Swiss-Prot record:
Biological function: Transfers the gamma-phosphate of ATP to the 4'-position of a tetraacyldisaccharide 1-phosphate intermediate (termed DS-1-P) to form tetraacyldisaccharide 1,4'-bis-phosphate (lipid IVA).
Origin species: Caulobacter vibrioides (strain NA1000 / CB15N) (Caulobacter crescentus)
A GO CC annotation given for this chain: plasma membrane
Keywords from the UniProt entry: ATP-binding, Kinase, Lipid A biosynthesis, Lipid biosynthesis, Lipid metabolism, Nucleotide-binding, Transferase
Residues that coordinate or bind ATP: 58-65
Enzyme Commission number(s): 2.7.1.130
Name assigned to this protein: Tetraacyldisaccharide 4'-kinase
Reactions it catalyzes: a lipid A disaccharide + ATP = a lipid IVA + ADP + H(+)
Length: 335
């Protein structure tokens, strides 16, 4: 059974679950040390095209996928043959394989690659070097690698760290700074940022400016600000929402902020498959309220085809506040 993300991870004060945090802290030291050693031992491979890595320093929920989409779109519009590369988390195929939206399902290649493959060439590969080289052989002149900041196997031309810009209500993207499993960090913040070329702060749909204290946390690092925007109106009338992402509560907030008449909302674990019984439960709940069903695009691609007709996907897109800053980074690597 997949477990959901503990919300107490993201409380800046570290006050919730003090006993749990204390008990898990020795495992955090082990995790951080193992990650550091693995990265230090690696010799990154040159794959024949510039690789832009979109990663993060937390366990999930930062918003990498919308940034990957926006980078692929930007590069494609500039005439670059940009391909996406993902590990394919949640899928059974190891790759390298190019995602085929007709032949593959989320159970094969993972939900995020399947979603992105609707618009861009996408590859999944457990071996990122093999996946990148396969993309180059297929004509890629640039590769956008999703979630590879702690993967040292591929030589990166540009490393971008995405950070969740939600800081309201005591929430903080790094929690109290502890490494997994005592906190949300994949590695200590300073260690992760030392390998990055820039930070992207991704703001929720209803936040105007990034928190000043958050910007201070990055020191002298270049920081780009992007914002999530609705790519379509929310469905009309009462809705029962559901989402299985790292931070499902963000979807509930975003739908409400966009004017959706949510009468109920159900969170599920990230990348989890939806069983027929679960979907029937959601449909029954919606029937009680005489409501529709709404979810994210990422969740929608995990639904069986018959259920996709009964659920409305609500798409969001990332938009950079200063496109010129992104352009300067891309020009710096010859793109």
């Amino acid at each position: 059974m997949k477990l959901g993300t503990p919300r107490w991870w993201y409380v800046k004060s570290g006050a919730p679950a003090p006993v749990t945090r204390a008990l898990l802290t020795p495992l955090s030291w082990l995790w951080a040390d193992t990650t550091r050693r693995r990265i230090a031992r690696a010799t990154p491979a040159i794959v024949g095209a510039p690789v832009i890595c979109v990663g993060n320093v937390t366990m999930g929920g930062a918003g990498k996928t919308p940034i990957v989409r926006e980078l692929l779109l930007t590069l494609t519009q500039r005439g670059v043959a940009a391909h996406g590369l993902s590990r394919g988390y949640g899928g059974k195929l190891k790759g390298p394989v190019r995602v085929d939206t007709i032949r593959h399902t989320a159970a094969d290649v993972g939900d995020e690659p399947l979603m992105l493959a609707q618009d861009f060439p996408m590859w999944i590969a457990a071996d990122r070097v093999a996946g990148a080289k396969a993309a180059v052989r297929a004509g890629a002149s640039a590769i956008v690698m999703d979630d590879g900041h702690q993967n040292p196997s591929v030589k990166k031309a540009l490393s971008l760290v995405v950070v969740d810009g939600e800081t309201r209500g005591g929430e903080w993207p790094f929690g109290d700074g502890r490494v997994f499993p005592a906190g949300p960090m994949r590695e200590p913040l300073k260690v992760g940022l030392s390998r990055a070329d820039a930070v992207i702060v991704l703001l929720p749909v209803d936040v105007e400016q990034p928190d000043f204290d958050l910007l201070v946390a990055f020191g002298d690092m270049p920081v780009l600000v992007a914002r999530l925007e609705a790519a379509a109106p929310v469905p009309k009338g009462p809705q029962v929402g559901f989402a299985g992402i790292a931070k499902p509560w963000k979807v509930e907030k975003a739908l409400t902020a966009a004017g959706c008449q949510l009468v109920d909302f159900a969170p599920f674990p990230d990348h989890g498959a939806y069983s027929e019984s679960t979907l029937k439960m959601l449909a029954d709940r919606a029937e009680v309220y005489e409501a529709g069903l709404v979810t994210t695009e990422k969740d929608w691609v995990r639904l069986p085809p018959a259920w996709r007709e009964r659920v409305t996907p609500w798409p969001v897109r990332a938009r950079f506040e200063d496109p010129a800053a992104l352009e300067a980074l891309l020009k710096g690597i010859g793109l």
